[in-house]
Amino acid sequence: MNTEEIARIVADQRAYFKTHATFDVDARRRALVSLRDAVRAHEADIAHALKTDLGKSHDEAYMCEIGTSLSEIRHQIAHVARWSRAHLRPCDLANAISVCKTQSVPYGVTLIMAPWNYPFLLTLEPLAGALAAGNTVVIKPSAYAPASSAVLRQICEEAFDPRLVTVVEGGRAENEALLDESWDKIFFTGSVPVGKFVMERASKNLTPVTLELGGKSPCIVDATANLKVAARRIAFGKWLNVGQTCVAPDYLLVDTRVHDELLGLIREETRRMFGEHPLDNEDYGHIVNAKHFARVRGLIDPDKVVLGGTARESSLKIEPTILDGVAPEDAVMQEEIFGPILPVLTFESLDEAEAFIADRPTPLALYIFSQDRAVQERFVRYVPFGGGCVNDTIMHLATSHMGFGGMGASGMGQYHGRESFDTFSHKKSIVNKATWLDVPFRYAPYESWKHKFVRIFVH
């Protein structure tokens, strides 16, 4: 798609937004219902596209993309009317004889730039929030998941007037052309370097941005943890989508006292999940493309492999791999892995573990396995990270009742449920003041008799 076509799409959406058609709550609900029905109608197409692009099994496709997206859409449908209403606020003395309220209004013409690793979930969830809030939306899916992008385009073409939602497929040229346009809001999910680039381009028009990025999310296991449960849940979170998950446990920090037992249990759980030959398992996915395959494979140090380590270039598959005895300066600790490699480091004290995490860029997620409530509270309260779990992994992502997002190097802003609606809304504060009484002492000239009243009213 060329720059002229993209400019026309944006202009058409802006003209449509100015008709105020999207301000009607019933219209928003109808749009969400259309989205829900279209996703349901294309469940088989979505599953097939995910199998093509990423090798995802049907069950994983439903659990992590289709079902979760439908749940979020249903949540927006259920709450859009209440969230869209004006909400009364208390009035202070200075605004006596007034009605004080907040009113959420849509930003306008918005851009959602989606990633390839969960191409439906990470497009449909922000889309639902944007529609509930009353915006028009241009979606730019990743070129790395072409089958999924094609299905997304088909879903949106069937469900929406293009003046409300349009999908723009393509690669870098289309990204550049889109970022040349003036937007009222940009929502980006992807890598830190590209997120910085998007924010830089958005700053030229002072466009507000939400950045959902990533980072090296730590998983801490102390000596009190239920190791069998920890092993199962760590294996689930790490090997899901063959590690291509922004909130996957990136590395393991384990107390030296339980190191050997925990690694043995993770090996057992991994074999139970995928068998002795995971590269031949049809339910075990593949790396998205040859470029990423080469990058991930290059992070494997053969001398430190204690599980897996084998890669098959013809199918872009890499075994679930555990690296033990990893040092902080190793290559695998210098970047977000985004693949099925779990580096293991040890600690002697909780102070050491906390300092290790705090000395690095703020991660998107953190996981702490411990039966000690004081330890749980310590890491949750005092260690900086976006969100996380106690005695589990990644499940904080799977709810519409709490927001999800990063901080620092892992992003800014939140979405899911009410947070999605708020992310795509501007909240106006309104004072509606009566005219039958006008307090005189707020007006100049400020004579001496007014001083006492001014102090009373504004203190």
Where would I find each of the regions flagged by the language model?
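ALDH superfamily catalytic-core signature
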Residues: 160, 193-327, 350, 390, ...
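Structural signal for hydrophobic packing residues in well-ordered secondary-structure cores
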Residues: 17, 21, 36-39, 43, ...
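Residue-level signal for inorganic ion chemistry
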Residues: 28, 73, 134, 165, ...
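N-terminal Rossmann-like NAD(P)+-binding subdomain of aldehyde/semialdehyde dehydrogenases
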Residues: 1-101
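Residues at or immediately preceding the N-termini of alpha-helices
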Residues: 6, 25, 43, 227, ...
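Conserved C-terminal structural/oligomerization subdomain of aldehyde/semialdehyde dehydrogenase
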Residues: 220, 271, 317-459
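Rossmann-like NAD(P) dinucleotide-binding subdomain of oxidoreductase/dehydrogenase enzymes
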Residues: 91-229, 347
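Aromatic/hydrophobic pocket-lining residues that form π-stacking "cages" and hydrophobic walls in ligand
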Residues: 126, 152, 198, 266, ...
